[in-house]
Amino acid sequence: MIDISGKDIVLREAIAEGFIKLKKDTIEKITKREIEKGDVIATAKVAGILAAKKTHELLPMCHPIPLEYINVEIEIENDGLKVVSTVRAHYRTGVEMEALTATSIALLTIWDMVKKYEKDEEGQYPLTEISKIRVVSKIKSYG
């Protein structure tokens, strides 16, 4: 890890988003809460929050950051689900990796919970796709 001891402790915020493309039937099942494994949206939100807290354990060069706020929102769209994660902390380094981790794990949780409905006759996933994972914004505030 790099030495951040000389940096000021300031408010850090990062927002990351990502998308999972799903079959229309699967989206309908999610909306109607008909997924056998449970409430997809609630489970993915919790998974994202837990993942953000574990980022430093997953990424070898990440600092353990005392996170003060994590929010994972999931929006149902026509062709899939969009995940938006917001993370905040007062610390010496940014929280982009925590926001990206929250988003990524929420998306993987969605895939895991709906994979039964996404497979074709041969057990493949011809439509399912995770994409557009990115940092939407990053704030470093001295105020």
Swiss-Prot record:
Enzyme class at the top of the EC tree: lyase
Catalytic residues (UniProt): D112
Alphabetical GO biological process terms: Mo-molybdopterin cofactor biosynthetic process
Keywords: Lyase, Molybdenum cofactor biosynthesis
Its EC number(s): 4.6.1.17
Coiled-coil spans in chain: none
Binding positions for substrate per the UniProt entry: M61, C62, H63, M97, E98
Reaction(s) catalysed by this chain's protein: (8S)-3',8-cyclo-7,8-dihydroguanosine 5'-triphosphate = cyclic pyranopterin phosphate + diphosphate
InterPro entries, per database record: Mo_CF_biosynth-C_arc, MoaC, MoaC_sf, MoCo_biosynth_MoaA/MoaC, Mopterin_CF_biosynth-C_dom
Top-level taxon: Archaea
Stored Pfam families: MoaC
GO MF annotation terms: cyclic pyranopterin monophosphate synthase activity
UniProt pathway: Cofactor biosynthesis; molybdopterin biosynthesis
Complex and partners: Homohexamer; trimer of dimers.
Protein family: Belongs to the MoaC family.
Known role: Catalyzes the conversion of (8S)-3',8-cyclo-7,8-dihydroguanosine 5'-triphosphate to cyclic pyranopterin monophosphate (cPMP).
Name of the protein in its database record: Probable cyclic pyranopterin monophosphate synthase
